[in-house]
């Protein structure tokens, strides 16, 4: 049974209260101004946030190509990694342990491995299929399946309640839905674009491979949903509480330039606008990854660093800035001499990123990097048959 509890009026009241005042008065939401963040630049080094950097090779059998990593989690001395080969577990040193499920139509099998998440309380791995959630134990044994609808793209977990985010397309009723253990919906956040008028067929979709809806900080789940949404929610089980607002100012993408409204206009005009793809946090900073809505040259399938802003928001100083200096954007690697680092995932002890060997090789040559002896020794052992590399930045502790 599909049960939905809408709290749009509460959300709108919170939004109005927060956007009417930029200060942190009691009862208002913290608001981060995107334009203010862009007004300042600062060079950052990895040693500012981490005390160690590790390159970890994922070592798998020859018939498994663990490449193009989309998500990483850590639980019980093992890495859970989502790549083009599926969702797999690796030991602490990167040795392959197991694969969760396989493609097919039987129990525990899936048609599309869209996303996954780890329930740290029940010690279960949950895979998002095209219309269901499939549960496994940490060793890869199938446990059960529940329905979740057909529009969920990303999932997160809070106290065993599964939250699913959609692409917020005009054909999807909700931005996010919470499901109980039986697959029934508990709460939903409405999609303001649902059934909105459009110029063309209204089926255009745009998303980024760097889009991350969920992150955890101090054992609390936070949800950003799609990048056109400017609210960060704090998740407590089935409750989603507006927690932080992003004021995009003149960079806010208008509805008329959404991909579903008019795809041609989106392709040719939306490059003026930006969205925040992901949020991470530690004691000092918010780590904000922002991307231009489309490429100004129409090269939408080509990665260009000019289409990204890597922003730190300093909680103590109450100000944000773009990480950019003489040595480039992001965190300069002053430990191993490798390419610049930017965190994509947070495991608690480590900030994590990933790179392919051939991308690393290209960056070393293009940027004329001088690797440390330790990293150079590792690099000399890698080649075209090397799987993806996890880059682990161990956090500094106060």
Where are these regions (language model features)?
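C-terminal motif of bacterial Sec signal peptides marking the signal peptidase cleavage site
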Residues: 17-20
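Conserved blade-ending motifs and adjacent loop-strand segments that build the rim/top face
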Residues: 243-268, 315-347
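Blade/loop signatures of beta-propeller domains
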Residues: 24-58
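Short coil/turn segments at the loop-to-beta-strand junctions that recur within blades
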Residues: 62, 101-109, 147-153, 192-196, ...
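Asp-box/WD-like beta-propeller blade repeats and closely related beta-sheet repeat scaffolds
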Residues: 129-174, 186-203
